[in-house]
Amino acid sequence: MSNITDPQMWDFDDLNFTGMPPTDEGYSPCRLETETLNKYVVIITYALVFLLSLLGNSLVMLVILYSRVGRSVTDVYLLNLALADLLFALTLPIWAASKVNGWIFGTFLCKVVSLLKEVNFYSGILLLACISVDRYLAIVHATRTLTQKRHLVKFVCLGCWGLSMNLSLPFFLFRQAYHPNNSSPVCYEVLGNDTAKWRMVLRILPHTFGFIVPLFVMLFCYGFTLRTLFKAHMGQKHRAMRVIFAVVLIFLLCWLPYNLVLLADTLMRTQVIQESCERRNNIGRALDATEILGFLHSCLNPIIYAFIGQNFRHGFLKILAMHGLVSKEFLARHRVTSYTSSSVNVSSNL
């Protein structure tokens, strides 16, 4: 077995959990010149994201589940988005601990948390693509038959979860806890003699069907949706779309940088661009930083709903009023002030 496929020969100090083994037969290990990121800053960041995500997404799910009468198709999608973020947030303490002592949690947790990370990403973009199609049909084609049949939305969401699981399944099957000599233990893919080739397949196929295709679907649908709104001068409907546009924008700002860096790393590993120690180090640092940005996404949607989503604020206050935590007079005043700007709620979202 050559040094490119034998885990004993890899320099794991240079590789993060998303890195790849070197592909060059004449490869010699590269050493990082400086620590990529202060691990304690990363740990504190993960802890804050965990707490905010746990609290925020739980509140989002609570508000949507309480509002059974006025629950829309978009609300069902956003409920599933919150569930995906909440499940991923539960893994953040494990990711944080691994930054200190390496991967000490064994193979099973290695598989599970890797699976949840990928499922969170893919389900997020697939659900957002479904929302874009729903808004496109409702606004551009004025189609209400599909959007009003909520039982169909449940099957669409199940399809998104199923596809996300399939796209993420290789991480569950092939990731293992491994403790190389003279290095901290890692959670890593072990694919046998053809590790480099199969890792290319495991990158290209999921990101094509789980990122690029849904991204183009969103760009197409929202492009025509915005065109229709501006052309028809639908000011109220445009304002009602603000939450959805904000959610999509935040998702792209958080996950697009990581995927672009991952693409650069893939091009380097396949020798499309020249590989060097300096380039490996730069890409490694960028992967670390952009992965944290992606993790941060799991706590941001509830913040968007709180600041932009009038229905979410009213639903939350309604729950508080039901339990005597705010007065019904205050709730009534809030309802009156928010009615004028949300009376035409084309997205029926938070």
Swiss-Prot record:
<comment type="subunit">
    <text>Interacts with IL8. Interacts with GNAI2.</text>
</comment>
<feature type="topological domain" description="Extracellular">
    <location>
        <begin position="97"/>
        <end position="111"/>
    </location>
</feature>
<keyword id="KW-1003">Cell membrane</keyword>
<dbReference type="InterPro" id="IPR001355">
    <property type="entry name" value="Chemokine_CXCR1"/>
</dbReference>
<dbReference type="Pfam" id="PF00001">
    <property type="entry name" value="7tm_1"/>
</dbReference>
<comment type="similarity">
    <text>Belongs to the G-protein coupled receptor 1 family.</text>
</comment>
<keyword id="KW-0675">Receptor</keyword>
<feature type="topological domain" description="Extracellular">
    <location>
        <begin position="1"/>
        <end position="39"/>
    </location>
</feature>
<feature type="topological domain" description="Extracellular">
    <location>
        <begin position="175"/>
        <end position="199"/>
    </location>
</feature>
<protein>
    <recommendedName>
        <fullName>C-X-C chemokine receptor type 1</fullName>
    </recommendedName>
</protein>
<dbReference type="GO" id="GO:0006955">
    <property type="term" value="P:immune response"/>
</dbReference>
<comment type="function">
    <text>Receptor to interleukin-8, which is a powerful neutrophils chemotactic factor. Binding of IL-8 to the receptor causes activation of neutrophils. This response is mediated via a G-protein that activates a phosphatidylinositol-calcium second messenger system.</text>
</comment>
<feature type="disulfide bond">
    <location>
        <begin position="110"/>
        <end position="187"/>
    </location>
</feature>
<dbReference type="GO" id="GO:0030593">
    <property type="term" value="P:neutrophil chemotaxis"/>
</dbReference>
<dbReference type="InterPro" id="IPR000174">
    <property type="entry name" value="Chemokine_CXCR_1/2"/>
</dbReference>
<feature type="topological domain" description="Cytoplasmic">
    <location>
        <begin position="67"/>
        <end position="75"/>
    </location>
</feature>
<keyword id="KW-0145">Chemotaxis</keyword>
<dbReference type="InterPro" id="IPR050119">
    <property type="entry name" value="CCR1-9-like"/>
</dbReference>
<feature type="transmembrane region" description="Helical; Name=7">
    <location>
        <begin position="286"/>
        <end position="308"/>
    </location>
</feature>
<dbReference type="InterPro" id="IPR000276">
    <property type="entry name" value="GPCR_Rhodpsn"/>
</dbReference>
<dbReference type="GO" id="GO:0007204">
    <property type="term" value="P:positive regulation of cytosolic calcium ion concentration"/>
</dbReference>
<feature type="glycosylation site" description="N-linked (GlcNAc...) asparagine">
    <location>
        <position position="16"/>
    </location>
</feature>
<dbReference type="GO" id="GO:0019722">
    <property type="term" value="P:calcium-mediated signaling"/>
</dbReference>
<keyword id="KW-0325">Glycoprotein</keyword>
<keyword id="KW-0807">Transducer</keyword>
<dbReference type="GO" id="GO:0016494">
    <property type="term" value="F:C-X-C chemokine receptor activity"/>
</dbReference>
<feature type="topological domain" description="Cytoplasmic">
    <location>
        <begin position="309"/>
        <end position="350"/>
    </location>
</feature>
<keyword id="KW-0297">G-protein coupled receptor</keyword>
<feature type="transmembrane region" description="Helical; Name=5">
    <location>
        <begin position="200"/>
        <end position="220"/>
    </location>
</feature>
<dbReference type="GO" id="GO:0016493">
    <property type="term" value="F:C-C chemokine receptor activity"/>
</dbReference>
<feature type="topological domain" description="Extracellular">
    <location>
        <begin position="265"/>
        <end position="285"/>
    </location>
</feature>
<keyword id="KW-1133">Transmembrane helix</keyword>
<feature type="transmembrane region" description="Helical; Name=6">
    <location>
        <begin position="243"/>
        <end position="264"/>
    </location>
</feature>
<dbReference type="GO" id="GO:0019959">
    <property type="term" value="F:interleukin-8 binding"/>
</dbReference>
<feature type="transmembrane region" description="Helical; Name=4">
    <location>
        <begin position="155"/>
        <end position="174"/>
    </location>
</feature>
<dbReference type="GO" id="GO:0019957">
    <property type="term" value="F:C-C chemokine binding"/>
</dbReference>
<feature type="glycosylation site" description="N-linked (GlcNAc...) asparagine">
    <location>
        <position position="3"/>
    </location>
</feature>
<keyword id="KW-0472">Membrane</keyword>
<dbReference type="GO" id="GO:0009897">
    <property type="term" value="C:external side of plasma membrane"/>
</dbReference>
<dbReference type="InterPro" id="IPR017452">
    <property type="entry name" value="GPCR_Rhodpsn_7TM"/>
</dbReference>
<feature type="transmembrane region" description="Helical; Name=1">
    <location>
        <begin position="40"/>
        <end position="66"/>
    </location>
</feature>
<feature type="transmembrane region" description="Helical; Name=2">
    <location>
        <begin position="76"/>
        <end position="96"/>
    </location>
</feature>
